[in-house]
Amino acid sequence: ICRCLVGSEMCIRDRYYIQKANRENFLYDLWDIDGGSIQYTHYEPGDYYTWHVDGDISNTFKPNIKPGSGVNISQDQVLQKGECVRKLSFSLQLSDAKDYKGGEVEFINSAGERYFAPKQKGTLIVFDSRTKHRVRTAKSGLRKSLVGWVVGPRWK
């Protein structure tokens, strides 16, 4: 477990839960968290993020990996394998649900069915990066989260 401070919030960044989610739900060929792309997000009243996907089969990029970062992929692998893709996305809820209204993370599947992520503080959601999702408009308070992506080789 690696603990990190984000402002006055204490969070736990633990690959264990992401690996477990992958084992139990996806079985994707993954390298690691793209550590250079983890983002602290906050939504104040009126803020939102429109419908989008974080990655698709045609969206490749060079990961932001620094030597000695603890990421389980070497720079040689990046150079040999070239580009990678975002395969899993994750969001760690940092705010208490009672501290804000609105700001729900909403998903939509290919059948048009909609789902909402839990809002409890400490909830980690892990989902396929090709899943269409959004953050609905924040109505009051402040919604805080950490979001990031797990990368791997191109889709086969």
Regions found by a protein language model. Give the residues of each.
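Single conserved hydrophobic/aromatic residue that forms the stacking wall/gate
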Residues: 1-14
